Amino acid sequence: MEQQESDTELSCPIYLFQGLPKGDKMEWIIQKCVELGVHAIVPVATKRAVVKLDEKKAQKKVNRWNAIAESAAKQSGRGIVPEVLPVMKWKEALEYARQLDVKMIPYEKAAGINATKQLIASVSFGQSVGIFIGPEGGFEEAEVEAAKAMGAVPVTLGKRILRTETAGMTILSILMYHLERE
């Protein structure tokens, strides 16, 4: 990951585990989440993901996504170019995330907003954060249970169910606001 001296980085590296969305939504998600301060993006093949990529197609997409991340990083004055990692299966993504300090999974059956606020408020300087966002159709119950078993905490993003392309940006914006330093 290319790095330069900058005061534009958040105090905590945030990893976005994004369920593969349809169409070109992933490009938009990458662009906006890089602008908001994400450290790395992990595309994830979940059970309900409509998009199925073979190895050759996946590599081509990842190359394109990294070019988009680089462009967004330059535009927003980032000190790093966040990496878009190769597409992972759900279990691989959970294993990769195991090392992170705080793991969140926005989920419509999560406890109320106060529990989410408390979890976000507990994130402190230097901790690594993983956010799991489902594809269109969300996560299967078994996927949420596997994430919880690995230490991910279900959180709510409010009373509305957000689209896959909105959910990651929403929680990143909340974390950015909480973690921003003068």
Residue ranges and their predicted role:
Residues M1-M104:
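RNA substrate-binding interface of SAM-dependent RNA methyltransferases
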Residues L20, Y107, P135, E165-T166:
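Conserved residues at beta->alpha junctions
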Residues K89-L94, A111-I113, L162:
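A short acidic, often aromatic-flanked loop/helix-cap motif at beta-alpha or helix-coil junctions
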Residues L100-G138, A142-E143, A152-V155:
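Active-site/ligand-binding-proximal alpha/beta "capping" segment
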